[in-house]
Amino acid sequence: TLMALSNKFGHMLLTTGNKSEMSVGYATIYGDMAGGYSLLKDAYKTTVFDLCRWRNDNVPTLGEGFGPAGPVMPERVITKPPSAELRPDQRDDDSLPPYEVLDPILYGLVEEELSVEQLVARGFDRDTVARIERLLYVAEYKRRQSPPGVKLGSRNFGRDRRYPITNAFRTL
């Protein structure tokens, strides 16, 4: 496995999870969460796609910067529908709203600490927001087991935002 190779050669394994996936529990303990550092831990999925497009459009020239001279993220990876790839033809939007809808809801719940009612007042569907809020609370146990990572936003998971994992906690 990658972790075994990491240990054998003394390298740190990086994880690929982002804030959107970690928020709603779309991460596998001892799977894509296994590693020593999470570069994308505090970046929402739409931000990750934006960063990929930006990097592909801003290619360093020889002697100007680090990295290969040319696009580094294939367009097919950016445009492919997101999936945990745990079963054939699975797509994240089979069970979640599109990330263009999910990420603003998560931003409101996590960064701004808004209630379901406040997000509904902003025009989001009540059932969708309530379901996302529930997923956010239920996935707390997974986030506690994730590797450390970069902090980009005002409220990252860990020190900035922790909720109980054992007592069926829900906000009132």
Q: How should these model regions be labeled?
A:
Residues 1-172:
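ATP/NTP-dependent adenylation/nucleotidyl-transfer catalytic domains that generate, transfer
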